């Protein structure tokens, strides 16, 4: 069974979420014949449900939205309007104005506007230390000159073309017994449901009822906030007549750092050391995210292997809303070996005397063959394999160029 966020529309058609296009069409035709208003006058609402479900699921883009996000995905992807709002209310129990999980209507019964989403890019330093910054946004506010009416009192009239719904609904017959309900934004009122004569329109907003205004938000980035976390400003989104403003929601986007990588409340870094440091101990200093100079010491006699990881407790990220508790810092060591011929050959024996003894080489009985180790570049692949591939390509080309299908070169 397909993994989907909601199955209501599939249930209406009586098909599983993984149904194919043909299965959807077959189910729709069967139900449309059964509940068509001409055949069953009392099943008008049921027929609308069936038509709506098929319209969504037969459209690949709408179906993907619905499968991934359910009702919420359709609410986001739809422009709203009277007719569509009615069918949403009937099927899902709410209007189109419940954007991003918010209720379609507020407690006082007013419709609720859409939320405004904005990314907020934050450095790792600011997420470690916390920061207060100002963000400038442009939003719609009710026109003060006409109090959001768009014109003088009594000038606003219901659009006769769409009867005040803002959309026009059309039913198109696809085949005998198969129809599709479609809707489009009313061109006469641009989806407003209302019209104002040009001479009566407000001079300031030109009848649009709202004007653009710059809003300065003071944003508090708390210590320990994480990538994807939300900062919400309630009721600060666009204003519209008769609609309660939605929220401005900022999504924290953590910037990449040149030294540290974050994993929850832990930090990771890579530090390069030489062979002598790996064998004889070391000390190094690095600058932390709060500008402290941290000294790391490792005692002589304890060996650091290439790629090994050591941990510094309590030097990770502060916990969100509990900043005195911190994660850990993990340091991965990249041991840099000397270049070839870095030491005088006469000194190699002295160096070998200082290092642990070589393992004993077992005696091999029988014939042996000595081979040479060569440099290998993993990005270029195996040389032998390339030669074989080149040979095969050459043979194929020659075969296709000079002989018929299946004919091979004769051997002398």
Swiss-Prot record:
This is DnaJ homolog subfamily A member 2. The gene is Dnaja2. The modification Phosphotyrosine is found at residue 391. A lipid is attached at residue 409 (S-farnesyl cysteine). The modification Cysteine methyl ester is found at residue 409. Co-chaperone of Hsc70. Stimulates ATP hydrolysis and the folding of unfolded proteins mediated by HSPA1A/B (in vitro). The keyword Zinc applies. Residues 410-412 form a propeptide. One of its GO terms (biological process) is response to heat.
């Amino acid at each position: 069974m397909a993994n989907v966020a909601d199955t209501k529309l599939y249930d209406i058609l009586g098909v599983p979420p993984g149904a194919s296009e043909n299965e959807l069409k077959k189910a729709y035709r069967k139900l449309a014949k059964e509940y068509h208003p001409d055949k069953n006058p009392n099943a008008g609402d049921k027929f609308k449900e069936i038509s709506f479900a098929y319209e969504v699921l037969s459209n690949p883009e709408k179906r993907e939205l619905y499968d991934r996000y359910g009702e919420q995905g359709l609410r986001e992807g739809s422009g709203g309007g009277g007719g569509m709002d009615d069918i949403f209310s009937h099927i899902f129990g709410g209007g189109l104005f419940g954007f991003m999980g918010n209720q379609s209507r507020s407690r006082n019964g007013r419709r609720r506007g859409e939320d405004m989403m904005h990314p907020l890019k934050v450095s790792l330093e600011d997420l470690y230390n916390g920061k207060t910054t100002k963000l400038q946004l442009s939003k719609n506010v009710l026109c003060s000159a006409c109090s959001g009416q768009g014109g003088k009192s009594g000038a606003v009239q219901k659009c006769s073309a769409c009867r005040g719904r803002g959309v026009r609904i059309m039913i198109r017959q696809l085949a005998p017994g198969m129809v599709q309900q479609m809707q489009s934004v009313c061109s006469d009122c641009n989806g407003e449901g209302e019209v104002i004569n040009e001479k009566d329109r407000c001079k300031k907003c030109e009848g649009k009822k709202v004007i653009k205004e710059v809003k300065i938000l003071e944003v508090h980035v708390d210590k320990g906030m994480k990538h994807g976390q939300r900062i919400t400003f309630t009721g600060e989104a666009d204003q519209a007549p008769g609609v309660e403003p939605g929220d401005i929601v900022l999504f924290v986007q953590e910037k990449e750092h040149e030294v540290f990588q974050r994993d929850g409340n832990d930090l990771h870094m890579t530090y390069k050391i030489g062979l002598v440091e790996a064998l004889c101990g070391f000390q190094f200093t690095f600058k932390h995210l709060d500008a402290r100079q941290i000294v790391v010491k490792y005692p002589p006699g304890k060996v650091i292997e290439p790629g090994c990881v050591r941990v510094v407790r309590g030097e990770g990220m502060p916990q969100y809303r509990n900043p005195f508790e911190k994660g850990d810092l993990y340091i991965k060591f990249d041991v840099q070996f000397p270049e070839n011929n870095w030491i005088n050959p006469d000194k190699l024996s002295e160096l070998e005397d200082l290092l642990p003894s070589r393992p004993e080489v077992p005696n091999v009985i029988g014939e042996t063959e000595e081979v040479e180790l060569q440099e290998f570049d993993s990005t270029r692949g195996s040389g032998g394999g390339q030669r074989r591939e080149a040979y095969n390509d050459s043979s194929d080309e020659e075969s296709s160029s000079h002989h018929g299908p299946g004919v091979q070169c004769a051997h002398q």
